[in-house]
């Protein structure tokens, strides 16, 4: 993006921000240099790769929609890559240009010819990258709005993006919340790339898919049984974190109900699941923003009350994971026994 165009965009964003403030629209996150004005698609660089979050429906919807948008804008089949948080943090950013979605904007992404379309909270300003950001919308919805500017919308996508948005933002008061949770659970159960292959990249095929009947049965039968069992099987990890042992049902909904009903003394509840590639994922939930801080300690990320982290590959089993988490999340007390200077050495008791 040349300097003249960049200056114009920032100027437009400044005007737009002023209008939003004047009419009491949703304010931008503090410090974020983001822009959502006019025909934003005309400002997007041609990407060498599109990178999205692998763990949920929002990442799937956002990634596939951006791939369609790139096809429309540049007549190119751009490679889609999906990452978990741990993999993403370790990934080198070698591409000259990229679109990143459903992954938090961070300093290393502030590169010329890079675009980030995301909704996670951030305090960073974009000086080189194009940042399209709104914490009040899912990543999928932000990407869909870009697609609509190029005539890529449809009633089927309207419906699917709405359901994905409701599930990702956990909009409990929306009348479609239960159904939206079933859609979101498809990715949790069948995994990102399996579902992508089944749909052949056509998101519309997900609407009213027969697998939703499986999700509905699991919700009606498994969730109540799982909730009752898990309530009695919460294991301490640290003073602030409890491990919810789950044997059946939708882990996220079970943990959410435990938090809502204050069935546990722990402000953060954690679940673990082992992927087919033997990697163990920790999912964290809270009510007052504590989950994200714990996830970041584990080199993960996400939202304030809904976060996740991939544990090191050396952690092979759930018991190993519990031991690892206890070591990382409990403050070490060695400094209390370590002499701080010569006076401490001479004053230390001798036996």
What annotation goes with each model-predicted range?
Residues 166-232:
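Hydrophobic, aromatic-enriched interface-forming segments
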């Amino acid at each position: 993006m040349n300097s003249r165009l960049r200056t114009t965009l920032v100027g437009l964003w400044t005007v737009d921000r002023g209008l939003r403030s004047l009419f009491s629209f949703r304010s931008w996150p503090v410090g974020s240099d983001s822009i959502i004005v006019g025909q934003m698609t005309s400002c997007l660089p041609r990407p060498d790769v599109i990178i999205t979050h692998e763990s949920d429906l929002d990442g799937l919807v956002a990634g596939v929609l951006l791939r369609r948008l790139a096809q429309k804008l540049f007549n190119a089949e751009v490679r889609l890559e999906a990452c978990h948080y741990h993999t993403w943090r370790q990934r080198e950013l070698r591409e000259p240009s990229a679109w990143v979605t459903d992954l938090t904007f961070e300093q290393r992404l502030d590169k010329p010819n890079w675009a980030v379309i995301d909704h996670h909270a951030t305090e960073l300003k974009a000086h080189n990258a194009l940042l399209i950001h709104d914490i009040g919308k899912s990543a999928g919805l932000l990407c869909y709005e870009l697609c609509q500017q190029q005539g890529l919308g449809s009633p089927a996508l309207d419906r699917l993006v709405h359901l994905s948005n409701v599930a990702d933002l956990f909009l409990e008061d929306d009348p479609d919340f239960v159904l939206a949770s079933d859609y979101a659970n498809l990715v949790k159960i069948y995994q990102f790339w399996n579902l992508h292959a089944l749909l052949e990249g056509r998101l519309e095929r997900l609407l009213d898919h027969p697998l939703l009947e499986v999700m509905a049965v699991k919700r009606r039968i498994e969730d109540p049984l799982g909730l009752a069992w898990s309530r009695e099987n919460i294991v301490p990890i640290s003073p602030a974190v409890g491990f919810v042992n789950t044997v059946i049902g939708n882990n996220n909904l079970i943990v959410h109900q435990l938090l809502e009903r204050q069935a546990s003394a722990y402000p953060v509840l954690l679940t673990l699941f082992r992927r087919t590639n033997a990697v163990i994922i920790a999912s964290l939930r809270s009510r007052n923003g504590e989950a994200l801080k714990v996830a970041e300690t584990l080199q993960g990320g996400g939202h304030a009350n809904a976060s996740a982290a991939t544990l090191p590959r050396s952690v092979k089993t759930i018991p190993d994971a519990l031991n690892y988490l206890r070591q990382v999340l409990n403050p070490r007390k060695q400094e209390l026994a370590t002499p701080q200077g010569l006076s401490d050495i001479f004053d230390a008791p001798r036996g």
